C-alpha cells in the first residue's frame, strides 16, 4: 500500500516551498511522493513472454502474483501502489541545461524508507552539483520481485515520463515542455534491472537517453544491456557491481568484446558519449547505493557528467 504519511508530508512540503519563476533558480529543495496515473502498478496484463497472466492466483476475492523468489504476493498489498518520488534540488535552474535522473529501486523497497532515507538517492543527486531533477517510481512494494509491470508495455514508460514532466512543472513553475525535452539518465539498483532492461528494449525515450548507470544490478538481461551499448555508441554505460551480479557483468563484457567494444575497468574521469565502464567492488549488496567502489557512488558518477552544472 502507498506510504500515505510520506505522500501527505510531501504534498504539505511542496505547498510550503516557493516555486521558481520562469528562468529563476529554485530557492529551496522540493521532495514529494505523489500518485501517478501511469504508474508501473497496478498491472493486469500478461507476463512479458506471453506465457500467462501476471496475476495468476485468486483466493477469497483477491488476486495475486507468484514471484519466483518471494512466493505469492497479493495485488492489494504489493502491486497497488501508484506512488512516484519527485525531487528538485535547491538551486535547480530550469533555464539552464538540465537532466532528469530516473531511479529504479531494488527488491524489498519503498520510496521513503529506502530510496530517500536509507540509500540517500535524493541527497546524492543534490550533492552531485548536477542541474537535475529526480524521478523514482514505486514498483512491487516491499517485495522480493523485480517485475516491471506496465513498463513491460512498449510506449508506457514514455507516457510515464510525460506525466512526470507535468508533475515537475507544477513543482517548479517551469513549463512541462522543458522537462519533456530534457535528456534522461537511467539509474537502476539490484532488481531495478528488469524495468531498466524493458525500457531499453522497448526504445522508450531513446532519443533523450544520455546514458545508463547500474548499481549491482545485472542479474539477468545481460544481452539486452550489451545490445543497447552496441547500438548507442553516443551514450554512456556504467555498471558498478559486487559478487552478486558479477556473472551478469562478465557476460556483458564478453558480448561487448565479441563486437570489438572495449569496456574499461577503471572509474571514468568523465561520463561522455561512448563511455563504457564495468567497475568491480567487494562492497556489500544491501548498502551498494551508498558504498560501492567508493562512497556515495551515484553522487560521484553524476558529478562526472559535464555540461549540466547547477
Which ranges hold each PLM region?
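A domain-start/cap signature at the N-terminus of enzymes
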Residues: 23-99, 264-267
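C-terminal catalytic histidine-bearing segment of alpha/beta-hydrolase fold enzymes
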Residues: 239-250, 258-310
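N-terminal export signals
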Residues: 6-23
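Alpha/beta-hydrolase fold nucleophile elbow
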Residues: 177-189
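Active-site machinery of serine-nucleophile hydrolases
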Residues: 106-165
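Conserved acidic catalytic loop of the alpha/beta-hydrolase fold
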Residues: 160-180
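A conserved short beta-strand
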Residues: 206-217
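Glycine-rich nucleophile elbow surrounding the catalytic serine of serine-hydrolase chemistry
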Residues: 187-198
Amino acid at each position: 500500500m502507498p506510504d500515505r504519511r510520506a505522500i501527505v508530508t510531501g504534498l504539505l512540503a511542496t505547498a510550503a516551498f516557493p516555486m521558481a519563476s520562469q528562468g529563476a533558480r529554485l530557492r529551496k529543495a522540493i521532495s514529494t511522493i505523489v500518485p501517478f496515473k501511469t504508474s508501473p502498478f497496478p498491472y493486469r496484463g500478461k507476463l512479458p513472454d506471453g506465457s500467462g497472466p501476471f496475476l495468476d492466483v485468486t483466493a477469497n476475492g483477491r488476486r495475486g502474483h507468484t514471484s519466483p523468489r518471494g512466493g505469492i504476493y497479493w495485488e492489494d498489498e504489493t502491486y497497488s501502489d501508484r506512488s512516484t518520488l519527485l525531487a528538485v534540488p535547491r538551486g535547480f535552474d530550469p533555464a539552464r541545461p538540465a537532466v532528469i535522473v530516473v531511479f529504479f529501486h531494488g527488491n524489498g523497497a519503498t520510496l521513503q524508507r529506502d530510496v530517500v532515507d536509507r540509500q540517500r538517492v535524493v541527497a546524492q543527486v543534490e550533492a552531485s552539483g548536477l542541474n537535475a531533477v529526480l524521478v523514482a517510481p514505486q514498483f512491487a512494494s516491499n517485495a522480493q520481485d523485480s517485475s516491471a509491470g506496465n513498463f513491460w508495455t512498449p510506449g508506457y514508460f514514455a507516457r510515464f515520463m510525460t506525466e512526470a514532466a507535468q508533475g515537475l512543472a507544477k513543482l517548479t513553475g517551469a513549463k512541462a515542455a522543458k522537462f519533456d525535452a530534457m535528456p534522461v539518465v537511467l539509474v537502476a539498483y539490484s532488481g531495478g534491472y528488469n524495468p531498466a532492461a524493458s525500457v531499453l528494449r522497448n526504445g522508450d525515450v531513446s532519443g533523450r537517453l544520455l546514458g545508463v548507470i547500474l548499481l549491482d544490478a545485472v542479474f539477468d538481461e545481460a544481452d539486452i544491456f550489451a545490445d543497447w551499448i552496441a547500438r548507442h555508441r553516443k551514450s554512456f554505460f556504467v555498471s558498478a557491481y559486487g559478487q552478486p551480479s558479477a556473472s551478469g557483468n562478465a557476460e556483458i563484457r564478453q558480448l561487448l568484446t565479441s563486437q570489438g567494444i572495449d569496456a574499461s575497468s577503471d572509474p571514468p574521469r568523465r561520463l561522455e558519449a561512448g563511455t563504457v565502464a564495468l567497475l568491480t567492488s567487494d562492497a556489500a549488496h544491501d548498502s551498494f547505493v551508498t558504498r560501492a567502489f567508493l562512497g556515495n557512488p551515484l553522487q560521484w558518477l553524476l558529478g562526472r557528467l559535464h555540461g549540466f552544472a547547477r
